[in-house]
C-alpha cells in the first residue's frame, strides 16, 4: 500500500547520561520533529520508507558532575535529515512472540542546511537489527538477536551519537540500542555491534521467566571493530503478559558498569 505521510511530534525529555555506571550529565530539552515520507508495503510483511525529517532541539537545563573537566555547551540545534528505512517482520505477536523474526535496516544523512553539516560534508548513520524466535514445544523459546549502528563522517553531533542500554530499543533516544545488564544510557564509540541470546520459559498462561546475555563491541573504526572494546552483560527477568501490556521486572549485571541493578517495566511501550 503506497502512502505519502506527514507527521509532527513534540517531546519534552529529562535525560540522564552515564559513563561506566556513573551519572555524568542530566539535561532537559524540547524536541520538535517534522517528517514527510513516502512508504510502500511489498509481499505483505516488507515495508520501506523514504523521506525528509526536520528536527529542532532546545536544551533548557544542564546538570553535570563537577569532576567533568569540560562540560558540553548545549546550544539549540536544528537538523535536516534524509532517510531510508526498511522493515520486514513475520513475528506472530508484538509481545512474547512464539515464532518468526523481525529485520530492520536504515540509512540516514544528517545535515543542518540540507547539504552540509557545520560547513563540511554531512555525517551519516547505518543501523541494522535482526531479532528472531525459535520455540521448542509450547513453553520454551530461544531468542537470538543482533543490533548494530555505524556512524560515518566527522564532527558528529552528540545528539546522534551511539548509545546503549535498556531492555528495548529507542526507549529514551530513537537510535538507542538495547543491552541486558545496563538499564540506563551509556554513550559509545562510532561503531557499535551487539549480539544477544535470551532463553524464555512460559510458566503458566501469561507468566514468563527469562535469562538473557549479550556481548557488545565498540570502536571508532568499523574495519577494526573486532579489536575494539568488549562489553558483557546479562539479566534474569520475570514477565506477565497483562491486558494492559507487559509487566516486567529484571535484575542484571554488566562488567562495563560493574554493578547489579533492578529494572521494572509497566505496560505498553
List each model region and its residues:
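Solvent-exposed loop/turn segments connecting transmembrane beta-strands
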Residues: 1, 28, 111-121, 152-154, ...
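Repeated loop/turn-to-beta-strand initiation elements of outer-membrane beta-barrel proteins
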Residues: 1-5, 44-48, 92-96, 136-142, ...
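Gram-negative/organellar outer-membrane beta-barrel architecture
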Residues: 1-83, 91, 164-175, 186-190, ...
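Transmembrane beta-barrel strands of outer-membrane/channel proteins
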Residues: 6-16, 50-56, 101-111, 144-150, ...
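Residues on the lipid-exposed face of transmembrane beta-strands in outer-membrane beta-barrel proteins
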Residues: 8, 36-40, 52, 84-88, ...
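Sequence/structural signature of outer-membrane beta-barrel proteins
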Residues: 11-17, 55-61, 89-93, 108-116, ...
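C-terminal outer-membrane beta-barrel translocator/porin domains of Gram-negative envelope proteins
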Residues: 83-87, 91-203
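C-terminal hydrophobic structural anchor segments
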Residues: 198-232
Amino acid at each position: 500500500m503506497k502512502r505519502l505521510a506527514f507527521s509532527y511530534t513534540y517531546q519534552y525529555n529529562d535525560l540522564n547520561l552515564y559513563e561506566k555506571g556513573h551519572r555524568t550529565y542530566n539535561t532537559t530539552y524540547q524536541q520538535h520533529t517534522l517528517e514527510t515520507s513516502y512508504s510502500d508495503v511489498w509481499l505483505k510483511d516488507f515495508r520501506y520508507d523514504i523521506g525528509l525529517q526536520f528536527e529542532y532541539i532546545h536544551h533548557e537545563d544542564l546538570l553535570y558532575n563537577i569532576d567533568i573537566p569540560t562540560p558540553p555547551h548545549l546550544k539549540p540545534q536544528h537538523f535536516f535529515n534524509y532517510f531510508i528505512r526498511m522493515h520486514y517482520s513475520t513475528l506472530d505477536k508484538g509481545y512474547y512472540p512464539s515464532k518468526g523474526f523481525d529485520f530492520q535496516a536504515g540509512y540516514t544523512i544528517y545535515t543542518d542546511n540540507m547539504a552540509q553539516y557545520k560547513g563540511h560534508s554531512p555525517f551519516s548513520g547505518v543501523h541494522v537489527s535482526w531479532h528472531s524466535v525459535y520455540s521448542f514445544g509450547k513453553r520454551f523459546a530461544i531468542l537470538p538477536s543482533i543490533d548494530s549502528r555505524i556512524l560515518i563522517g566527522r564532527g558528529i553531533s552528540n545528539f546522534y551519537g551511539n548509545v546503549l542500554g535498556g531492555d528495548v530499543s529507542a526507549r529514551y533516544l530513537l537510535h538507542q540500542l538495547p543491552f541486558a545488564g545496563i538499564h540506563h544510557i551509556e554513550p559509545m564509540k562510532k561503531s557499535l555491534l551487539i549480539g544477544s541470546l535470551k532463553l524464555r520459559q512460559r510458566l503458566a498462561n501469561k507468566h514468563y521467566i527469562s535469562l538473557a546475555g549479550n556481548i557488545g563491541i565498540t570502536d571508532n573504526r568499523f574495519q577494526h571493530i573486532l579489536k575494539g572494546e568488549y562489553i558483557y552483560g546479562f539479566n534474569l527477568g520475570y514477565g506477565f503478559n497483562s491486558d494492559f501490556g507487559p509487566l516486567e521486572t529484571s535484575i542484571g549485571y554488566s562488567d562495563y558498569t560493574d554493578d547489579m541493578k533492578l529494572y521494572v517495566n509497566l505496560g505498553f511501550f
